[in-house]
């Protein structure tokens, strides 16, 4: 059992868990989604809730919210079940991978990974939890697992080789509702021996509870029943279909799709209709707490006069992304845009999210399908109009092109009102509209909006500022090819990656004559030759970027390949480079960089370093030339949510690196920002300043030029520290060249550009 203790600062709802004045370099920030609340658990002053598989709590006294995640307290991600025990002040947290956390007193976590690590043929779902004395009984896909909350350990595992839907425990027996009928066992017997379990009924109950000293069972699609504990006969208490049934304090609560049954006791039941969208309902001290899905966490009191639930706390949803979707991300100035879903086997809800001024918002989703007559889904890219920051276009991998203004839907472009083409030769128009496959939205320097159209003749379309269209076709890119990502390099050349039947890279130079394709240079390459003359048959190509030196980096299924001289791409003797990393083992041998990794995302930071995302091995930070690995973050050695990286976007002004994974979004505060073109007095400064005795982080000097030479001296002019900026920023650990902490005093920072033509100075006060 692993124990982790973290003290979390209460965060008010209007402040949110993501709002910080300045992130410390090297720190991680949480951007998980906490929408779609599916379960609630009262715990005294706190109400715990699961939103999109993540845990948050609401404090009834000060209305603050705490968001819990792997980076501040928890051991894992993607929560499937929670249950709270008042006596031991313990929240049991079950993750989808069967990992278990015990959150005690809201500040201590005891991790129980044994169940997750156990090799089993059966699935490891936890279907229900009930409590008796110091024990928690977990109903699983194979039997019953018992936790000792006092000792904070797994006490027993009863392998019954059948699914257990729910358990109930009284002073003498355990009752287990299995997929084959009702089982019982005496608590005084050795229940590890299956012979000590008895099947007492063939009735399959979906839920069990001890309520008013009576065993209650729910039979799916039939109703709730009283069960005689002597002969296990049963009699109906109420009829109907109920999707859940739980006991809280002196209340029994049952619900179906649109109504509730609230028990004051067995003989006093209130039936409430028209309560749609309640995924779970709990109760404590006169207040019902609803998991209202998209409505969030809702607190309600029962009005005995009107026989209804009256809302007293409404729509508690932490400021967070609407969904844990991160298919494509990009920054426009200080605004982060996320296109949620692209080429997936499962359709994703149409999702465009924006993070601006530390607040998350979403573009309109409701009523788009009604207005267009087609489902709104699979948003694959987004582009902001350079002439009007309120106008945006979004592509769908299946439904064409959407236009928005001020986040509101304006127009839908598809095969029957624009040049966009249908991917397959289908004669049924009703099916046509699901095959207008658009991606790669990008503006060029002339404010033309470029996009790719999958598996059609005119695979590139351009929407000009005047509303006219240009449709491009080149013979080497046939209808089996799907161009995906588009970038424009410093020369204005277009580069695009292709996936599907033929993976490769397409390059186009229009020579600034967009509407005259006769003078265009264009080439599609599927097989690259590296610097050693080796033919590389990369079956998959995922991403493409240009770095600050004009070098093109391409992410493939066998590591990155580099185009050091992209201007030679159209030549017959063109070749790519695979970076060779020396082994430094005395053999003079070297290995190709990350050749065993799928490179799914690449981003370039202010220091021209490369952030490399992989499909199964986390994220790397590489030096500008790729020869040095500065960081390698994985889900095992960092708060990274998953090793499956889908997208990366960097705020060039702050250095914050946003990392999209298949389990959601988080960010890392890097030490590199975009460099300045020249030194400006007000822009060059150090923080924190003064540096107080209790500060343990690095001191940052910002506002610098690329590769600024830094010298730090004391008041006597003695050199204390020296180095080179990373992009527009330099960090100092407060130590001298010998590695010792410097004493109190004033320290001067002398900065000069790499050519020695510009210089500037600032100072730092250190107080011990």
Give a label for each model feature.
Residues 387, 444, 489, 694, ...:
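Surface-exposed coil/turn segments at beta-strand junctions on protein surfaces, enriched
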Residues 725-757:
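Short, surface-exposed loop/turn motifs with a glycine/proline- and acidic-biased composition
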Residues 648, 725-729, 766:
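A short acidic/small-residue loop/turn micro-motif
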Residues 759-764:
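Edge beta-strands of extracellular beta-sandwich domains
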Residues 1-27, 450, 493, 768:
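Bacterial Sec-dependent N-terminal signal peptides
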Residues 21-684, 719:
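Carboxylate-rich, polar loop motifs that coordinate divalent cations or form catalytic acidic clusters
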Residues 710-720, 747:
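Short, glycine-anchored, charge-dense loop/turn motifs used at functional sites
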Residues 678-711, 729-732:
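Glycine-centered coil/turn sites that cap beta-strands in beta-rich domains
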């Amino acid at each position: 059992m692993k124990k982790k203790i973290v003290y979390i600062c209460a965060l008010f709802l209007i402040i949110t868990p993501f709002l910080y004045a300045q992130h410390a370099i090297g720190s991680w920030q949480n951007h998980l989604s906490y929408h779609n609340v599916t379960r609630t658990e009262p715990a005294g002053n706190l109400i715990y809730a699961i939103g999109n598989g993540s845990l948050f709590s609401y404090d009834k006294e000060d209305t603050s919210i705490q968001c819990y995640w792997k980076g501040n307290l928890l051991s894992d991600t993607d929560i499937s079940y929670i249950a709270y025990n008042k006596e031991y002040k313990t929240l049991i947290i079950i993750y989808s991978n069967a990992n278990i956390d015990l959150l005690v007193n809201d500040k201590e976590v005891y991790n129980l990974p044994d169940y997750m690590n156990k090799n089993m043929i059966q699935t490891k779902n936890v279907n229900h939890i009930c409590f008796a004395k110091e024990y928690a009984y977990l109903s699983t896909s194979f039997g019953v697992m018992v936790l000792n909350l006092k000792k904070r350990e797994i006490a027993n595992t009863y392998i019954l080789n059948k699914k257990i839907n729910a358990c109930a425990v009284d002073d003498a027996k355990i009752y287990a509702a299995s997929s084959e009928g009702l089982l019982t066992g005496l608590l005084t017997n050795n229940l590890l021996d299956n012979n000590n379990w008895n099947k007492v009924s063939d009735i399959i109950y979906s839920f069990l509870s001890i309520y008013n000293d009576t065993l209650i069972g729910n039979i799916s699609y039939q109703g709730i029943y009283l069960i005689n504990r002597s002969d296990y006969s049963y009699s109906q208490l109420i009829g109907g279909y109920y999707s859940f049934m739980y006991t809280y304090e002196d209340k029994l609560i049952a619900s179906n799709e649109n109504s509730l049954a609230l028990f004051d006791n067995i003989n006093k039941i209130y039936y409430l209709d028209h309560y749609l969208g309640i995924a779970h309902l709990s109760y404590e001290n006169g207040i019902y707490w609803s998991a209202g899905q998209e409505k969030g966490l809702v607190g309600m009191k029962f009005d005995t006069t009107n026989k209804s639930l009256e809302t007293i706390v409404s729509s508690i949803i932490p400021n967070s992304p609407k969904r844990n979707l991160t298919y494509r991300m990009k920054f426009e100035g200080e605004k982060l845009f996320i296109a949620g879903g692209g080429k997936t086997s499962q359709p994703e809800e149409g999702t465009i999210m924006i993070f601006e001024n530390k607040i998350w918002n979403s573009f309109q989703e409701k009523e788009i399908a009604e207005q267009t007559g087609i489902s709104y889904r699979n948003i694959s890219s987004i582009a902001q109009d350079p002439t009007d920051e309120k106008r945006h276009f979004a592509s769908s991998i299946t439904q064409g092109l959407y236009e928005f203004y001020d986040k509101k839907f304006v127009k839908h472009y598809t095969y029957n009102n624009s040049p966009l083409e249908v991917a397959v030769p289908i004669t049924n128009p009703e099916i046509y509209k699901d095959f207008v496959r658009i991606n790669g939205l990008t503006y060029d320097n002339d404010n033309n909006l470029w996009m790719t159209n999958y598996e059609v003749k005119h695979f590139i379309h351009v929407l000009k500022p005047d509303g006219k269209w240009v449709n491009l076709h080149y013979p080497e890119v046939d209808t089996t090819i799907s161009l995906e990502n588009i970038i424009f390099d410093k020369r204005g050349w277009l580069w695009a990656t292709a996936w599907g039947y033929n993976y490769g890279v397409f390059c186009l130079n229009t020579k600034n004559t967009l509407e005259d394709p006769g003078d265009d240079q264009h080439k599609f390459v599927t097989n690259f030759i590296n610097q050693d003359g080796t033919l590389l048959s990369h079956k998959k190509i995922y991403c493409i970027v240009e770095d600050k030196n004009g070098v093109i980096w391409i992410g493939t299924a066998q590591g990155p390949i580099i185009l050091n001289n992209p201007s030679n791409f159209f030549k017959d003797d063109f070749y790519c480079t695979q970076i060779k990393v020396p082994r430094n083992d005395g053999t003079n041998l070297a290995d190709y960089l990350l050749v065993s990794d799928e490179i799914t995302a690449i981003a370039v930071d202010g220091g021209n370093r490369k952030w490399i995302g992989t499909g199964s091995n986390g994220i790397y930070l590489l030096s500008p030339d790729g020869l040095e690995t500065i960081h390698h973050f994985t889900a095992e050695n960092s708060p990274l949510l998953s090793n499956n990286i889908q997208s990366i976007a960097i705020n060039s002004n702050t250095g914050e690196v946003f990392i999209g994974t298949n389990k959601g979004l988080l960010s890392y505060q890097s030490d590199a920002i975009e460099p300045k073109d020249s030194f400006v007095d007000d822009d060059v400064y150090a923080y924190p300043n003064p540096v107080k005795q209790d500060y343990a982080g690095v001191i940052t000097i910002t506002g610098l030029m690329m590769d600024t030479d830094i010298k730090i001296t004391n008041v006597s002019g003695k050199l204390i520290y020296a180095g080179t900026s990373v992009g527009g920023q330099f960090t100092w650990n407060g130590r001298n060249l010998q590695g010792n902490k410097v004493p109190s005093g004033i320290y001067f920072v002398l900065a000069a550009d790499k050519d020695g033509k510009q210089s500037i100075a600032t100072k730092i006060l250190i107080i011990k």
